[in-house]
Amino acid sequence: MNPLRPKRLGMLAPSSNTVLEPETVKLLPANGSVTAHVSRLRVVQVSAEESSLQQFDLDRALVAAELLADAKVDLILWNGTAASWLGFDHDERLVSAIERHTGIRATSAVIAINERLTRLGARRIGLVTPYVAALEERIIDNYRDIGVTVAGAVRGDLTENTAIAEIGQAEIAAMAREAARTPVDAILILCTNLAGSSVVRQLEQELNVPVLDSVRVAVEQCLELLAEEPRRA
């Protein structure tokens, strides 16, 4: 093992997601001390239809995770947000299964987001998603169940994942402003196929509240975890 090699972040990505990889690269250390490696699982549209929900079957994700293990990554991140509408226990089960099958530490974007909300003490949030009403309702209910009130919500009403990636930064920022019209403790941009990372600092200065972008929060947590993890052989 080369003790000087970069730490390797393995990411499980929805197959039609075209945002998270370029956004992740922007957030990694400029010195090259961490590299990102991606395995994909088929996800082409997001809705409350049963066929859409089945895209996030644990067994499918495990196949993709096992391929990442072949690259001897040091950490595996499920970089999707489906647990926000499937139920937060979905990602807890997935992370446990990945760790059990691969022996590699794992986390998820939703786990990172919820840990950040807890750290901030955020109990009222503004929610920005590209999703349809049925998914938004599930997300709001799931956050209510963990003591977080969605005080303002703005959605894009899209189901095709490739269309979600086309939402521009100006539109994302406008959605965040709308979600912050009522007093909130934080704004959550919930979707790893929304290019919200680059507008976070601008929005935080403008709105004077923390703004949590899914990709950014996930990468920040992973960098913290990688600092604790030894390099794999």
Show the residue positions of the predicted features.
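N-terminal glycine-rich anion-binding loop in soluble enzyme alpha/beta folds
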Residues: M1-V63, V128-G168
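Periplasmic-binding protein-like
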Residues: G10, D74-N79, G126-V128, V184-C191
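A short, acidic, amphipathic alpha-helical segment used as a generic capping/interface helix at domain edges
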Residues: R60-E66, G168-T182
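Glycine/small-residue-rich loop that forms an oxyanion/phosphate-binding "nest" at active or ligand-binding sites
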Residues: A65-T107
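Short, small-residue-enriched loops and turns at beta-alpha junctions
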Residues: A82-G87, E160-E166, A195
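Short, acidic/small-residue loops that bind anionic groups at enzyme active sites
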Residues: E92-L117, L203-C222
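Short, flexible loop segments at boundaries between secondary-structure elements
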Residues: L158-A163, V211-R231
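Hydrophobic alpha-helical
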Residues: A174-E206, V219
